[in-house]
Amino acid sequence: MTEQFDKTYCGFIAIVGRPNVGKSTLLNKILGQKISITSRKAQTTRHRIVGIKTEGAYQEIYVDTPGLHIEEKRAINRLMNRAASSAIGDVDLIIFVVDGTHWNADDEMVLNKLRNAKAPVVLAINKVDNIKNKDDLLPFITDLSSKFNFAHIVPISAQRGNNVHELEKIVRQSLREGVHHFPEDYVTDRSQRFMASEIIREKLMRFTGEELPYSVTVEIEQFKVNERGTYEINGLILVEREGQKKMVIGAGGQKIKTIGMEARADMERLFDNKVHLELWVKVKSGWADDERALRSLGYMDE
């Protein structure tokens, strides 16, 4: 039975930053489970992922965005940038994540976009455990403080969880009095079908290393429950060239077998249900440059 409170609090929080600074890792750490995929490759997140954390009277609704970056040559990159930018406009708090003291032109671009934001901005300096000379941190903070009026500046390690609880205290202070938007047991508003495609895509990123560029996506062609209660999931992996198809399949089909086994294990943990997963690979030339095709695959800019 849901506990009743005299007052409840709720708010929307956008997690923004350039690609590969740890936004998805931070969201997963806050939620206590993986809902947003992570990889050492930049721009792993392609969709706005909504993560929900409810504790007692407080509900935090997080938007984990694709990484904002300057390069916009392909249609998929333009859509991802627009999706990330639109997340900034309608939230109660913005968490701007940067990678230690590594500041570049993409960070500067994100900062300039935040100048028009109505919500307060918290700077989360991630991966501080990787900063070898901690004496570099204070001048870096001083320099950024002169560029922008941040509400708070919090050094964190999203991977290890260092100082993440301090960030959450700030988040909770930003919540407004109001009704909760989701039931207390929800951790995301995304469907199981969507989460299945994201899990497969994460394994693709992980097991193809640097071999496979970002011209790969996953379409769930079937997601049904059979008479035994098992989830039967068919995933179609789309690549742009025949050579990429061979990379995904691997010698003797070993790579796609590994991808499938690892993805199935993650799905069974997330869905708490037995899963039968089948994967196919198909060449669809130019899909990442075709906005109509991207929208049909679920890539939206709003």
From Swiss-Prot:
Q: What does this protein do?
A: An essential GTPase that binds both GDP and GTP, with rapid nucleotide exchange. Plays a role in 16S rRNA processing and 30S ribosomal subunit biogenesis and possibly also in cell cycle regulation and energy metabolism.
Q: Which residue intervals make up region (G3)? A: 64-67
Region of interest: G1 = 17-24
Q: Which UniProt keywords apply?
A: Cell inner membrane, Cell membrane, Cytoplasm, GTP-binding, Membrane, Nucleotide-binding, Ribosome biogenesis, RNA-binding, rRNA-binding
Subcellular localization, as worded in the UniProt entry: Cytoplasm; Cell inner membrane
**Name assigned to this protein:** GTPase Era
Q: Where is this region: G4?
A: 126-129
Family statement drawn from the similarity comment of this UniProt entry: Belongs to the TRAFAC class TrmE-Era-EngA-EngB-Septin-like GTPase superfamily. Era GTPase family.
What is annotated about its quaternary structure and interactions? Answer: Monomer.
Q: Name one GO cellular component term.
A: cytosol
UniProt domain Era-type G: residue ranges: 9-177
G2, as annotated region: 43-47
Q: What is the membrane topology noted in the UniProt record heading this document?
A: Peripheral membrane protein
* Cleaved signal peptide residues: none
Q: What is its main location?
A: cytoplasm
Q: Which SUPFAM superfamilies does the UniProt record give?
A: P-loop containing nucleoside triphosphate hydrolases, Prokaryotic type KH domain (KH-domain type II)
Start and end of every KH type-2 domain?
Answer: 208-285
Which example biological process does GO assign this protein? ribosomal small subunit assembly
What PROSITE patterns does the record tag this protein with? Answer: G_ERA, KH_TYPE_2
| UniProt cross-references to Pfam families, sorted A to Z | KH_2, MMR_HSR1
| Gene3D superfamilies for the chain | 3.30.300.20, P-loop containing nucleotide triphosphate hydrolases
Gene Ontology terms, MF aspect = GTP binding; GTPase activity; ribosomal small subunit binding; rRNA binding; small ribosomal subunit rRNA binding
Q: Domain of life of the organism in this record?
A: Bacteria
What segment(s) does the record annotate as region G5? 156-158
